[in-house]
Every structure is written in C-alpha cells, then in structure tokens.
C-alpha cells in the first residue's frame, strides 16, 4: 500500500459533494460526468434531467447536494455557480460466478465507482458551454 494522498483543500468560493460506491463502471459514469464539466449549474442540471443514461439521476442528485452545500455551508450565491471539477474514481469490484454449460463457470465482475463534484462561485461573466 502506498502513502495516503492529502485531500484537496477547498477554497473559500468552492463547495464539494461526494457520492461513494455507485453501482456503475467508472468508464460509463465518466461519459455522463464529462457532459457537465465547466458548465453553469443550471445548464448542467438541465442536461442531466434530459439525459437518457441510467446513472444521470445519481449524478444529478450529487450535483444538487453540492449546490445545497454551497448555499447552506459556504454561503455562496447559487446563481453564479459553475461545475469547476467533476471526476470519477474506481471503487471495489465485486466478483460473482456465472454458471455455464458443461459444468463450467465463469467470473462476472461488477465494478463500482466514486464521484466527486466541486462547484465554484464566479464573479465575472462565464459563457455557458
């Protein structure tokens, strides 16, 4: 095991929300998270609401949690928030056996993911991407 990483310190104009052990592969989750990076939170919520991906609802809940943290814990203006960072990490991989023909068995791997969303309050005009 390696040395534990020091967690990133939030600035005064930032808020964070983390969703851990989400039942989706990191690759699939990253497709949805890439849609909202750098966008204003209103545009990002609209994009997630109309996304057809299964995991978009969980990402939307995590983004709403980050917005609520910004408003309640950090006293930030929610109308001027952007998604500053959104990244995906690997979690556990649960292994299961799948019974096959002729007395054989194969392994099924069910990956899990972690999701971190950091929103930042901006004062200058930022274009919605």
UniProtKB/Swiss-Prot annotation:
Pfam families named among the record's database cross-references: Ribosomal_L22
- Could you tell me the superkingdom of the organism this chain comes from? Bacteria
Spell out the Gene3D superfamilies in the cross-references.
Ribosomal protein L22/L17
Q: Which GO terms describe its cellular component?
A: cytosolic large ribosomal subunit
Entry's InterPro entries? Ribosomal_uL22, Ribosomal_uL22_bac/chlpt-type, Ribosomal_uL22_bac/org-type, Ribosomal_uL22_CS, Ribosomal_uL22_sf
Q: Which cysteines are joined by disulfide bonds?
A: none
CDD domains, per database record: Ribosomal_L22
GO MF, one annotated term:
rRNA binding
Alphabetized UniProt keyword annotations:
Ribonucleoprotein, Ribosomal protein, RNA-binding, rRNA-binding
Mention one GO biological process in which this protein takes part, according to its record: translation
Q: Which NCBIfam families match?
A: rplV_bact
> How does the annotation summarize its subunit structure?
Part of the 50S ribosomal subunit.
Which HAMAP family does this entry report, sorted A to Z? Ribosomal_uL22_B (MF_01331_B)
Instruction: State the family it belongs to.
Output: Belongs to the universal ribosomal protein uL22 family.
Q: Which PANTHER family match?
A: CHLOROPLAST 50S RIBOSOMAL PROTEIN L22-RELATED, LARGE RIBOSOMAL SUBUNIT PROTEIN UL22M
Quote the function comment for this protein. Answer: This protein binds specifically to 23S rRNA; its binding is stimulated by other ribosomal proteins, e.g. L4, L17, and L20. It is important during the early stages of 50S assembly. It makes multiple contacts with different domains of the 23S rRNA in the assembled 50S subunit and ribosome.
What is this protein called in UniProt?
Answer: Large ribosomal subunit protein uL22
Q: Gene encoding it?
A: rplV
């Amino acid at each position: 095991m390696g040395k534990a990483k020091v967690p990133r310190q939030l600035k005064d104009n930032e808020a964070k929300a983390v969703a851990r052990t989400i039942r989706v592969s990191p690759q699939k989750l990253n497709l949805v998270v890439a849609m909202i990076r750098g966008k204003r939170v209103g545009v990002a919520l609209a994009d997630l609401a109309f996304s057809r991906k299964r995991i978009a609802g969980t990402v939307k809940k995590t983004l709403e949690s980050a917005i609520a943290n910004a408003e309640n814990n950090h006293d930030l203006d929610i109308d001027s928030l952007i998604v500053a960072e959104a990244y995906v990490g690997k979690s556990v991989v649960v292994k299961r056996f799948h019974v096959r023909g002729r007395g054989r068995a194969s392994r099924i791997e069910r990956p899990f993911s972690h999701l971190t969303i950091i929103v930042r309050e901006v004062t200058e005009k930022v274009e919605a991407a």
